[in-house]
Structures are given as structure tokens and as C-alpha cells.
């Protein structure tokens, strides 16, 4: 599976006029600036490989899955002064199936990529939410 996207989203009519405390007008023109929170590029590459095991095997089926998700550049403000560059995370999963039971071993952000998941400004301060670090897990499933 392969998906990619390019977005060119800019302001076309966004001008703000505010007044200073002394009454002097300040005009800010955002025309041509990128719209915040919209990644310029997104990318997803994924694949799956399944092995049907022999009747003598303990497992009925083994499935390997991997995908790479990427996004960027993402601007966080209308001024386009804070942004996240293009980044990607690699995820994988291995499923071991035995009849109606399955055990899965998985990892998210396997390359431990450091990235900003979200950013906002309030009261003249910027706050950034970091993306999740590398995670590992095991899932157990039983169908009735």
C-alpha cells in the first residue's frame, strides 16, 4: 500500500487591523502564508506478508505487517514562524495465530523519531506537545 498527498493551502484574503494602546493602527497581512495545522505533504507506505504454516506447526498462520507514516512541513501559526519539518514514524506488528487465538507483538515509532505533535500559543507563550516516543506492546485475542 502506498499513499501520498501534497497540499498547497494558503490564505488569499486574510488581513487584520488592530490598534495599539495609543490608537495607532497596525495592519497584519497573512495573504500567501500557509494555513496552520495543514501538512504540506503526507505519506503512507505499508505492507503485509502472511505465511500459512504446515499442519505440524504450532501456529496456523504468521502475519508480518509494517507501515511508515510521514507528514510535514506543518506550520503551527498564521505567521508561519513556528513549524514542524517533514518527519516519519515506522510501525510494525507480528501476529501469531492459533485457531481462534492470536498473540501480537508490536512497536510504534520504532525509530524513536522526535517530533512535535501539536503546538499552540496563548498569552504570548508557545506550548508544544511532543510526539510519543518508541512504544512496544503485546496484544492477546481470543474469538468465541
Segment roles from a protein language model:
Residues 60-61, 80-82, 107-108:
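Composition- and surface-driven signal marking solvent-exposed, interaction-prone regions
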Amino acid at each position: 500500500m502506498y499513499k501520498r498527498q501534497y497540499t498547497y493551502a494558503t490564505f488569499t484574503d486574510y488581513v487584520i487591523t488592530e490598534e495599539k494602546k495609543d490608537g495607532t493602527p497596525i495592519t497584519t497581512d497573512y495573504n500567501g502564508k500557509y494555513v496552520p495545522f495543514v501538512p504540506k505533504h503526507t505519506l503512507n507506505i505499508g505492507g503485509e506478508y502472511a505465511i500459512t504454516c504446515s499442519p505440524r506447526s504450532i501456529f496456523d498462520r504468521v502475519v508480518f505487517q509494517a507501515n511508515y507514516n510521514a507528514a510535514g512541513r506543518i506550520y503551527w501559526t498564521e505567521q508561519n514562524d513556528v513549524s514542524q519539518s517533514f518527519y516519519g514514524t515506522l510501525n510494525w506488528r507480528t501476529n501469531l495465530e492459533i485457531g481462534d487465538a492470536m498473540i501480537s507483538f508490536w512497536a510504534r515509532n520504532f525509530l524513536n523519531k522526535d517530533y512535535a505533535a501539536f503546538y499552540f500559543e496563548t498569552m504570548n507563550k508557545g506550548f508544544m506537545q511532543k510526539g510519543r516516543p518508541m512504544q512496544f506492546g503485546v496484544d492477546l485475542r481470543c474469538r468465541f
